[in-house]
């Protein structure tokens, strides 16, 4: 086994086998793992928010689904991965908070993160 590389919140990284990537504490965040089985290049992003255009402080591309997934893909392609072989797995997107104890009025950042991530993967042609 190679090195275990930690990916923090609003962060992303890539590696090649035998190294591995890990993240913890997803909650409403999304963990997006990309993998090219031929070159064994992997990528992992810990996405916090769905849309970089919704807030002013958006310089950290890894924080957002719309920019983080794109940046992760670019890094993997530079490392030798092929876009047509890359497969994606998504984890996280929990509904974390309810306002005034009313579950129907929950802040739904998790669902928004999931939908934005799926949309970006479709736009990029990643399955």
Where are the predicted features?
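Conserved mixed alpha/beta catalytic, RNA-binding, or beta-rich assembly cores of soluble enzyme
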Residues: 22-79
